[in-house]
Swiss-Prot record:
HAMAP family: GatB (MF_00121). It comes from Rhizobium johnstonii (strain DSM 114642 / LMG 32736 / 3841). It comes from the Bacteria. This is Aspartyl/glutamyl-tRNA(Asn/Gln) amidotransferase subunit B. GO terms for biological process: glutaminyl-tRNAGln biosynthesis via transamidation; translation. The keyword Mitochondrion does not apply. It holds the Pfam family GatB_Yqey. GO terms for molecular function: asparaginyl-tRNA synthase (glutamine-hydrolyzing) activity; ATP binding; glutaminyl-tRNA synthase (glutamine-hydrolyzing) activity. Signal peptide: none annotated. SUPFAM superfamilies: GatB/YqeY motif, Glutamine synthetase/guanido kinase. Keywords: ATP-binding, Ligase, Nucleotide-binding, Protein biosynthesis. Gene3D superfamilies: 1.10.10.410, GatB domain, N-terminal subdomain.
């Protein structure tokens, strides 16, 4: 494969070294476990967390005479993913044997795709920002290919003092290997790419994206060069399993390579591991080339062939993807690009927001979801699937504000009650006497008392009318936030002789 540089060197992404500026080049190979009930070539279950070696068929264990049979759902999931990446779908693809020895690879080879993958070139658009001017930078990252392959088993070295064990539950599980082009120029871009890719496959329902369970992991290829020069020798960092670690691994590896080159050394092409405890990479083995694996077509599997009708049927069934949803939120609901980006970052958040916004003002719903709900979830270490406040409950709080039943301040208190205790917002307001005071007589009495008690402030307001806000705040405080803010403001201005 010939590597093509499509990016213009950008000084703001350069890494300063002792002898001048450097540029980091990043490409990624992401292994995404296909969401399916059974494995790629057998009927064994893919359920996570089952007892060791309980999800294993004769095919997975490579018993003699056991032949692989392709799982149609895995093929469909790969095509769906390719369509979501705006990629070329290859109507004919082949499975190959990738030959290497490892204890948790019972066949002695991995069934993969080499020269003829199921999906060809595509792209992902990532967005960095906002910057100090509130602007976002969109960057297109090329996709080289997507191919299907089997996962290996898992070697376990902590079960016995002198022996290692092998768990084959994962052996034969379908993986999509999504290979990017070397188009990323910083750790931030790489993290944004992984975040966006995970969001896309979750929207599509083709991978759950749970990196902590190994459902999605990345091999990160890193090299450095002087700006504008040819690509340098790359090192591959294997099986990085969190977005934060991807960033840390790239930062460390770029600095390591720069240090070697500035000392007059050369970079060896090798495979490395990232140690998250030390925040550094370490050598694992020399990097293999394709010829080391002796690829050849798998004689037990026919070519995969499908027609336009097959592809179009899958395309017609695709859900709305993050970029399209973001554009719709901005266009139809009047949201800012930032707010829309936050809301579409995860499908579950977008679904929650749309349920709250249905029949309500979109901007108001967005403010409550982003600032109050997501803020509270971050404080408590929960994600959107664990939220104790349902869309119906949050929507009810917004409705109570619109109806004038409660003030914005009381709504914040009500939200915290629902967050901690649950319950129907309207019933809580009634039971706890949280209704907004709309009786102008009661509000006028409070205004008169505050004005009478603060003659000095009255004189200041005459000189500077904007200070009337101080009186509004004092009245709201005196009424426990229950007074209607608009009524308070109108009465304060009238009493102080301030023209509207």
């Amino acid at each position: 494969m010939t590597l093509v540089d499509v990016r213009t060197p950008d000084p703001k992404r350069f890494i300063p070294g002792a002898t001048g500026d450097w540029e980091v080049i990043v490409g990624m190979e992401v292994h995404a476990q296909v969401l399916s009930n059974s494995k790629l070539f057998s009927g064994a279950s893919t359920e996570f967390g089952k007892p060791q070696n309980s999800n294993v068929s004769m095919v997975d264990a490579a018993m003699p005479g056991m032949l692989p049979v392709i799982n149609e759902e895995c093929v469909k999931q790969a095509v769906r993913t390719g369509l979501g990446l705006k990629a070329q779908i290859n109507k004919r693809s082949l499975f190959d044997r990738k030959n290497y020895f490892y204890p948790d690879l019972p066949q002695g080879y991995q069934i993969s795709q080499f020269k003829d993958p199921i999906v060809g070139e595509g792209k992902i658009v990532i967005s960095l920002g906002p910057d100090r001017q509130g602007q976002f930078e969109d960057i297109e990252i090329g996709i080289e290919r997507l191919h299907l392959e089997q996962d290996a088993g898992k070697s376990m070295h902590d079960q016995h003092a002198t022996m290692s064990y092998v768990d084959l539950n994962r052996s034969g599980v379908a993986l999509m290997e999504i290979v990017s082009k070397p188009d990323m120029r910083s750790s931030d871009e790489a993290k944004a790419y992984m975040t966006k890719l995970r969001s896309i496959v979750r929207y599509l329902g083709t991978c759950d994206g749970n990196m902590d369970e190994g459902s999605m992991r990345a091999d990160v290829n890193v090299s450095v060069r002087r700006p504008g020069e040819d690509f340098g020798t790359r090192c591959e960092i294997k099986n990085v399993n969190s977005i934060r670690f991807i960033g840390q691994a790239i930062e460390y590896e770029a600095r390591r390579q720069i240090g070697i080159l500035e000392d007059g050394g050369k970079i060896d092409q090798e495979t490395r591991l990232f140690d998250p405890n030390k925040g550094e990479t370490r050598s694992m083995r020399s990097k293999e080339d394709a010829h080391d694996y002796r690829y050849f077509p798998d004689p037990d599997l026919l070519p995969l062939e499908f027609d336009d009708a097959f592809i179009k049927a899958l395309e017609a069934d695709l859900p709305e993807l993050p970029d399209d949803k973001k554009e719709r939120f901005v266009r139809e609901l009047g949201l800012s690009i930032y707010d829309a980006s936050v809301l579409v970052s995860e499908k579950a958040i977008a679904d929650y927001f749309e349920a709250v916004a249905a029949g309500r003002d979109g901007k108001t719903a967005a403010n409550w979801v982003i600032n109050d709900l997501l803020g509270a979830l971050n404080r408590t270490g929960k994600d959107i699937e664990q939220t104790p406040v349902s869309p119906a409950q949050l929507g009810a709080i917004i409705d109570l504000i619109k109806a004038g039943t409660i003030s914005g301040k009381i709504a914040k208190d009500l939200f915290e009650i629902v967050l901690a205790e649950g319950g129907d917002p309207a019933e809580i307001v009634e039971a706890r006497g949280m209704k907004q005071v709309t009786d102008t007589g009661a509000i006028e009495k409070a205004v008169d008392e505050i004005i009478a008690a603060n003659p000095d402030q009255v004189e200041k307001v005459k000189a500077k009318p904007t200070m009337a806000a101080w009186f509004v705040g004092q009245v709201m405080k005196a009424t426990g936030g229950k007074a209607n803010p608009q009524a308070v403001q109108a009465l304060v201005k009238a009493k102080l002789g301030i023209e509207e």
